[in-house]
């Protein structure tokens, strides 16, 4: 998924 803060792909790990 996308991180809703940075909007970077696959940052939400």
Swiss-Prot record:
Keywords: Amidation, Neuropeptide, Secreted. Its main location: secreted. One of its GO terms (biological process) is neuropeptide signaling pathway. GO terms for cellular component: extracellular region. This is Lymna-DF-amide 1. It is found in: Secreted. It comes from Lymnaea stagnalis. The modification Phenylalanine amide is found at residue 13. It comes from the Eukaryota. The lineage of its organism: Eukaryota, Metazoa, Spiralia, Lophotrochozoa, Mollusca.
